């Protein structure tokens, strides 16, 4: 689960992290009052969406020369002007896809005099099975680009869960970031605070980009991105209360009600598969044959007929879907259950696009028999390669 920047900063501030003063607003009418609550004279007006690249993003409704989703303002009047232009419009960034996200809230924050921009994140490093800090002196830019072009500028420090952040860890981190004086002292206080927040709140990612050193030598969390482990949310009612469902895909929300693993993508071939590995392989082979998957959808190993029906309905509700591939390898999941669920869904919502079904495993003959006797216009496939070729050909020929 993701939260907005202003929520992440409030959470980190509650642990003692240094963040600037700021006010979240939901309408342009609140902008002037928000600015008056801050010291000024420099303000930052930040679009609050669950996506990165806001500063370089562009609003669909505005001209090509319009400023992006993060703007500087030198007066309260300028804050108001930015708010009126940004709220309600659609911000397109490298992470939103071409459809973008509507900006429904802004964060008005006190400006900062920046001397250096650094990068810091905390995540689970699965290669060592520990929580790890990832830091770089190259802050304020895409860490992926740094990793690609200058990987030597990224330092990873795994934290022993029994010891927490030790003095040796702090020495390694502060030296990697080339910190000294007050900035180093601030970092030695901040890093254990961030680690504590990460662990106590069951985060899956805590990213501060940039973490800045100001001209006065002090450190500040200038931006914050926080994601939480969805499997641990039952322990954190306060975190669940921060959820903004308007930032989530409606189909993903609907899928979660039925315990379906669904992720919306930008392609036009809907996929219904059992097992995450097989689902990823299915998406890969669709791309191999020149098409793009519209979703990742794993119905799991013990899905019922009703669950399969809902999964199929979620796929068909996506107007971008021009064809559907059902790829099932039955183990715990029985092929006849899949067949019954697909047929029930088609009878309820209709079938307006090509449908390719590949079944293998437990009760496969019964599953095929159910589909063949259903009277539906279903294209059968013998294996994954055959299925991918058939659905791509059917969509391109439609």
Curated annotation (Swiss-Prot):
Q: Which Pfam families match?
A: ATP-grasp_2, Ligase_CoA
* Boundaries of every ATP-grasp domain copy: 9-254
Cofactor needs: Mg(2+)
Keyword field? ATP-binding, Ligase, Magnesium, Metal-binding, Nucleotide-binding, Tricarboxylic acid cycle
E.C. no: 6.2.1.5
Reactions catalysed: succinate + ATP + CoA = succinyl-CoA + ADP + phosphate; GTP + succinate + CoA = succinyl-CoA + GDP + phosphate
Whether Metal-binding counts among this entry's keywords is: yes
Named in its record, the pathway it takes part in is: Carbohydrate metabolism; tricarboxylic acid cycle; succinate from succinyl-CoA (ligase route): step 1/1
Q: Where on this chain does Mg(2+) bind?
A: 209, 223
Binding of ATP, residues: 46, 53-55, 109, 112, 117
Q: Which positions are annotated as binding substrate?
A: 274, 331-333
- Sorted alphabetically, which InterPro entries does this protein's record hold? ATP-grasp (IPR011761), ATP-grasp_succ-CoA_synth-type (IPR013650), ATP_grasp_subdomain_1 (IPR013815), Succ-CoA_synthase_bsu_CS (IPR017866), SUCC_ACL_C (IPR005811), Succ_CoA_ligase-like_bsu (IPR005809), Succinyl-CoA_synth-like (IPR016102)
Question: What's any GO biological process attached to this entry?
Answer: tricarboxylic acid cycle
The molecular function terms in GO held by this entry are: ATP binding; magnesium ion binding; succinate-CoA ligase (ADP-forming) activity; succinate-CoA ligase (GDP-forming) activity
Cofactor binding mode, per the note?
Binds 1 Mg(2+) ion per subunit.
Q: Which GO terms describe its cellular component?
A: cytosol; succinate-CoA ligase complex
HAMAP family from the UniProt entry: Succ_CoA_beta
What is said about its interaction partners and assembly?
Heterotetramer of two alpha and two beta subunits.
UniProt function note: Succinyl-CoA synthetase functions in the citric acid cycle (TCA), coupling the hydrolysis of succinyl-CoA to the synthesis of either ATP or GTP and thus represents the only step of substrate-level phosphorylation in the TCA. The beta subunit provides nucleotide specificity of the enzyme and binds the substrate succinate, while the binding sites for coenzyme A and phosphate are found in the alpha subunit.
What family does this belong to?
Answer: Belongs to the succinate/malate CoA ligase beta subunit family.
- Name of the featured protein: Succinate--CoA ligase [ADP-forming] subunit beta
Origin species: Sinorhizobium medicae (strain WSM419)
